[in-house]
């Protein structure tokens, strides 16, 4: 196992990395050198063969031009002269009919005047272009690499034959192998020297690191007296010097570590809430950003001050009571912002029982309290809205039971009031059910792409025909605007807004409709303005709250439930839109609705 540990040491790893870098470098150089050398040698070989073939081509062309009757004999003599090169195995002249007219190889003389079926020869004759390829052939001494070259011979524009040359390229590769062997031997010698040098070089790096490792082991045992030997002024020497300084400082700081560790652990545990940490006297020493935000104070106003005074608890609790009482309680810690927090206190105690500080954890429950308050208000509003018509109905029914039904004048009036109150309760219950579905996201929204101009004009026309005493003014763009909405749900929204506009208008009633499109953001804004009594500026933002009425008596008299605009807001937001209001008291109210939209040309809208 000792050799395995030595193999895993930094010293060995540095040597291995050093050797691997050398090997990789030599491999890259060798690969490039071998490929370049092979390419150069083969190109030179082929260039020489092509030069011989070109000389043959010129001579054969001259023979066929000067003495065609005696051409075969003269070509044979010519090939015999060119066949004395060592690398050339065979030279043939093949006429345009693929008949062997002459050959330089004696063993192939029996093939003269015979037709040869060779694809490369046929290709050279048919295309009139030279070609070449490599093959392996056995000439009796084993398989050898042969380079075959075909060069067409032309007399003017007519191809009269083809020169076929087989050349032995094996010598080129033998020469290349010899060079590679020399390169490999040189690489091996270099690696041997590199390994030896690598061990000595790596030792100069690992020796100080080994010393620091040994010192670290001693420090883990609590021994801070030893120092690391500094071997030089390089980076490792500076590291050794810094390590010695660190050892000294750790020794000095060890006494304070336990107390700080416990305090920081407590702070980290509760970082999602507001954290206030103090010393043993209750003076604030650490406070996080959340606590600063919740208290609405700066860090300078908190650090060093008494924690109970900061939380306005100085008259109610003492540090001893906090230490004994672990109960949490609600505290209004920021009256300006209306922030309510649940406060938990904990005490930091050492193992000896000595108290070193206190921790206050502030958990923001403002939203929870708001939800609970809204729930109570909602229940109270529903109870009130149901109790009023029920009380009225009960009174009329009691009167009818006592004999009013016999009165032909009063009975119909009492029954009419009872029916109206019943219908109002039905509307209220239906609105509550719709809001409940929207809160639970179970309300079905069935969107479809509609022509908004046609959609809004249809709604306005319906109200215009029903309300003869109201003037409707339209400013709607002429270009077609398409939007994806649920027509029924959005009709409910516009009916709600238009009905309110007509209901609260006065004098010469006037309702204006403005539609403006922002093509850059694919949004459109619909503005519906009345000339009614308006809404006080401090109540404008509340009109979309459930059961909120600016004038409760007038709204109830007109049959409203106080839920119409709340439902409208939920529907618009379900369409990725927004609804809000602007109003000047005594000058009317404007309701704004924004929705996604597209301006689509007729050609883009045609279905395939």
Swiss-Prot record:
Name the record gives this protein: Sensor protein kinase WalK
Domain PAC: from-to ranges: 324-377
Reaction(s) this enzyme catalyzes, per UniProt: ATP + protein L-histidine = ADP + protein N-phospho-L-histidine
Segments forming domain Histidine kinase: 381-599
Keyword Membrane found: yes
Main location: membrane
Any one GO molecular-function label of the UniProt entry: ATP binding
One GO term describing the cellular component: plasma membrane
Residues annotated as transmembrane: 14-34, 182-202
Signal peptide positions on this chain: none
GO biological-process terms attached to the record: osmosensory signaling via phosphorelay pathway; regulation of DNA-templated transcription
């Amino acid at each position: 196992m000792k050799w395995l540990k030595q193999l895993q040491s930094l010293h060995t790893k540095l040597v291995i990395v050093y050797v691997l870098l050398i090997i990789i470098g030599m491999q890259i150089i060798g690969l490039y050198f071998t490929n370049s050398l092979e390419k150069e040698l083969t190109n030179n070989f082929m260039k020489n063969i092509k030069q011989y073939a070109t000389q043959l081509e010129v001579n054969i062309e001259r023979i066929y031009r000067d003495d065609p009757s005696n051409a075969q004999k003269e070509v044979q003599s010519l090939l015999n002269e060119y066949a004395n090169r060592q690398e050339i195995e065979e030279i043939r002249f093949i006429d345009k009919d693929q008949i062997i007219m002459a050959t330089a190889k004696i063993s192939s003389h029996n093939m003269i005047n015979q037709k040869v079926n060779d694809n490369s020869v046929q290709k050279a004759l048919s295309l009139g272009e030279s070609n070449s390829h490599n093959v392996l052939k056995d000439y009796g001494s084993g398989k050898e690499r042969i380079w075959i070259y075909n060069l067409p011979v032309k007399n003017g524009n007519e191809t009269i034959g083809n020169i076929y040359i087989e050349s032995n390229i094996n010598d080129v590769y033998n020469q290349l192998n010899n060079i590679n062997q020399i390169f490999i031997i040189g690489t091996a010698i270099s690696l041997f020297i590199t390994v030896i040098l690598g061990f000595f070089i790596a030792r100069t790096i690992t020796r100080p690191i080994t010393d620091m490792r040994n010192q670290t082991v001693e420090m883990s045992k609590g021994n801070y007296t030893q120092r690391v030997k500094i071997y030089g002024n390089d980076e490792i020497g500076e590291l050794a010097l810094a390590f010695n300084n660190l050892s000294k400082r750790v020794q000095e700081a060890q006494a304070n570590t336990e107390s700080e560790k416990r305090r920081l652990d407590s702070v980290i545990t509760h970082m999602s809430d507001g954290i206030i940490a103090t010393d043993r006297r209750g003076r604030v020493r650490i406070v996080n950003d959340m606590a600063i935000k919740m208290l609405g104070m700066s860090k300078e106003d908190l650090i060093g001050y008494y924690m109970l005074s900061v939380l306005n608890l100085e008259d109610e609790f003492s540090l001893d009571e906090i230490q004994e009482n672990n109960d949490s309680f609600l505290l209004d810690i920021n009256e300006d912002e209306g922030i309510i927090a649940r406060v938990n206190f904990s005490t930091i105690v050492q193992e000896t029982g000595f108290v070193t500080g206190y921790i206050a954890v502030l958990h923001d429950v403002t939203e929870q309290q708001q939800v609970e308050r809204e729930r109570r208000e909602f229940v109270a509003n529903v109870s009130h809205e149901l109790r009023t018509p029920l009380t009225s109905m009960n009174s009329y029914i009691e009167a009818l039971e006592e004999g009013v039904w016999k009165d032909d004048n009063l009975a119909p009036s009492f029954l009419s009031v009872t029916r109206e109150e019943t219908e109002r309760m039905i509307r209220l219950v239906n609105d509550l059910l719709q809001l409940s579905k929207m809160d639970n996201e179970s309300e079905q929204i069935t969107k479809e792409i509609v022509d908004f101009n046609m959609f809004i004009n249809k709604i306005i026309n319906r109200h215009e025909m029903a309300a003869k005493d109201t003037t409707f003014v339209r400013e709607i763009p002429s270009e077609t605007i398409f939007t994806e909405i649920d027509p029924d749900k959005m009709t409910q929204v516009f009916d709600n807004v238009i009905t309110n506009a007509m209901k609260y208008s006065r004098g010469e009633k006037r309702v204006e409709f403005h539609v403006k499109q922002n093509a850059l953001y694919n949004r459109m804004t619909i503005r519906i303005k009345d000339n009614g009594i308006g809404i006080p500026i401090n109540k404008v933002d509340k009109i979309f709250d459930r059961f909120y009425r600016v004038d409760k008596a007038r709204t109830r008299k007109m049959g409203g439930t106080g839920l119409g605009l709340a439902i409208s807001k939920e529907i618009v937001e379900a369409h990725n839109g927004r609804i809000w209001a602007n109003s000047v008291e005594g000058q009317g109210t404007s309701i704004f609705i924004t929705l996604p939209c597209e301006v689509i040309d007729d050609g883009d809208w045609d279905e395939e």
